Amino acid sequence: ASYDPKRGEGKYDTVELGATLDQALATKGEEAAGVKCTSCHKMTDEKLVGPGWKGVTERRTPQWIMNFITNPDPMIDKDPEVQAQLEICLVRMPNQGLSDDDARGILEYMRKNDGVK
């Protein structure tokens, strides 16, 4: 199967998003991100170790984000845009072993950060 740059690679074919933000889910995601993500990622567009998260939900589909944060290794190997980021950041994102619930919460936290109300 060929690599789909809109979907990524992993178990998520679609991710249902509410029209409005799920505040409780975003709060859980913020907690998970604080443990697993924010040592390398800022919530702005500034690079820390990895790229900043600002605008990611506008650039990427929900399923791409969910697949990437739960299954980064094959996507780093196959996605040309991720490979370009790797040349800038120089560090491969390690698999953080996120649960489905944590990954979905982190996606909601990213949506909140990008201004979804």
What is each of the regions a protein language model found here?
Residues 34, 38, 42-45, 58, ...:
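Sec-exported extracytoplasmic/periplasmic mature domains
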Residues 48-56, 73-102:
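Axial heme c-ligation environment in periplasmic c-type cytochrome domains
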Residues 1-33:
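Electrostatic cytochrome c docking/interface patches
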Residues 63-68, 91-117:
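C-terminal capping alpha-helices of c-type cytochrome domains
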